[in-house]
Every structure is written in C-alpha cells, then in structure tokens.
Design a protein with these regions (language model features):
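Conserved active-site carboxylates
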Residues: 100
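A generic fold-level signal
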Residues: 26-27, 53, 96, 121, ...
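Long, positively charged amphipathic alpha-helical accessory segments at protein N-termini or as interdomain linkers
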Residues: 66-68, 75-93, 103-240
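N-terminal lobe of the biotin/lipoate ligase/transferase fold
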Residues: 1-87, 91, 109, 116, ...
Length: 240
C-alpha cells in the first residue's frame, strides 16, 4: 500500500501538491501526506492550523468516474475517519455537518473536498483531511483553542501517526473503491453519528436559524423553519 502514499516532510499545501499530481496522470487513488504545511487551507479560504509533527495533514486523490453522488464524498470521508477513530483509538466521535469530526471537548478533524474539472468535466476529487493527533488544547492559537482538541488531549495517549494515516487511507479505499457500503448505508450511519440533528442551527449563508431534522440521500442537511423544509448542500452551519 505504501506505493499509493507520498510522504513529505514539508509542503506548502498537500492540496496544491495533489492538484498538480492528479493532472500529471498516474494510478489513483493516491494520498499525499505531509508532516508540516506552510500554507494549509481550510474552508472559505481560511488557513488551516497545521504545525510540524503534531497532526495528520493529507489529501486523498480520487477519480470520480465511479462515484455516483459527488455530494456524498465529504460525508463518506468523514465516516471513514470516524470508524478508524473508533476502532483504533477507542474514541466515539460525532459528525458536525458538513465536514468536522468532533470528540467530547472539541473538533479533532476537518475535511475539505475540492472537485477538479478537466475539459469541462469533473474528473478528480481532492479530499483534504487534517487530524489533530498530539498536543494539548492550550497549544492551539487563541482563536481556536476553545473549540479544538487532539487525540492526545482526549485519551492521554500517544498514537503512531503513520499507522493511523494508513488505517484511514485503507478505510477510504474500502469505502470509495471497494464499495464497502451502499450510499444509503453511508447516509444512515452518518445520521446516527450526527451532532446536529434535532437541534437549532444557524446557517450563515441564509443568516438565519433553522431546526436540523435529517440528512438527505445525497448528504445535504435537511432543515425546518416553521412549516417550511429545505435542503442545504453547502455553506457554514453552526450550533445556535
């Protein structure tokens, strides 16, 4: 499996590296993993805190030709990570729609999917995964220390990043390539793990509050405002 993983000591961004790599041809899927990112990217153009040696920073490159529902890519990747945290780290996690994995005291993982178009057609998905492995909450920048956590903080244990990385990639392969689950099973599993269902949530793009009631068959967040129901497929959603 190691020939399907590129390990880097340092890179500007695994996503930028993967972007160039996927356009150059070669067998997929493949993962780009770095020990340190100088320009790690998060959602909405924000930087992603990725200090040297403390986390898993990777981009998994997927050919989308056999992916039926593109909107489920991030959802499926979140399930892959959550299962490994449960099986390898003995941690029960929840999923904060659309792209965060939460533990009891905060966010431990963020997932960012970017679709790459070639000659007018969506050809690749770059699935960025960042996991806070070692360190304590006080080690984070002031603006995120109250909402972030690490595997070490939660368990008091040190985890082998290489083993953890390879287990996650193996599970991504099982879900995306070997079709470990049907799309319906993926959605049902994520519903069970959802941190948002049956709660009031604030949708920033709408600038208003809704009540989260379900996850749609294509991974959208189903919300209710009075008697009106709608499905949100992108944007930022926070707990009210």
């Amino acid at each position: 499996m190691n020939d399907k993983i590129i390990y880097l000591d340092e890179v500007d961004s695994t996503n930028l590296y993967a972007d160039k790599l996927c356009r150059s041809g070669g067998e997929l899927p493949i993962a780009v993993v770095a020990d340190f990112q100088t320009k790690g990217s998060g959602r909405m153009g924000r930087s992603f805190h990725s200090p040297k040696g403390t986390g898993i920073y990777m981009t998994y490159i997927l050919d989308t030709q056999n992916i039926e529902t593109l909107n489920l890519i991030t959802t499926s990747a979140g399930l892959a990570v959550a299962e490994v945290l449960e099986e390898y780290c003995s941690l029960i996690s929840s999923v904060k729609w659309p792209n965060d994995i939460l533990l009891s005291s905060g966010k431990v993982c963020g997932i960012l999917t970017r679709l790459i178009t070639v000659e007018g057609k969506i050809k690749f998905a770059l699935i960025g995964i960042g996991i806070n492995v070692s360190g304590k909450k006080q080690d984070f920048p002031e603006e995120i220390k109250d909402i972030a956590t690490t595997l070490e903080e939660e368990t008091g244990k040190a985890f082998n990043k290489k083993i953890l990385t390879e287990k996650i990639i193996e599970n991504l392969n099982e879900i995306f390539i070997n079709k470990k689950y049907t799309e319906k099973q993926i959605v049902e599993d994520v519903k069970k793990r959802s941190a948002m269902l049956n709660k009031n949530v604030f949708v920033k793009g709408e600038n208003r509050e809704f009540f989260a009631v379900d996850i749609s068959s294509d991974g959208g967040l189903v919300v209710r405002d009075g008697g009106e129901m709608k499905v949100i497929h992108s944007g930022e959603v926070e707990f009210s």
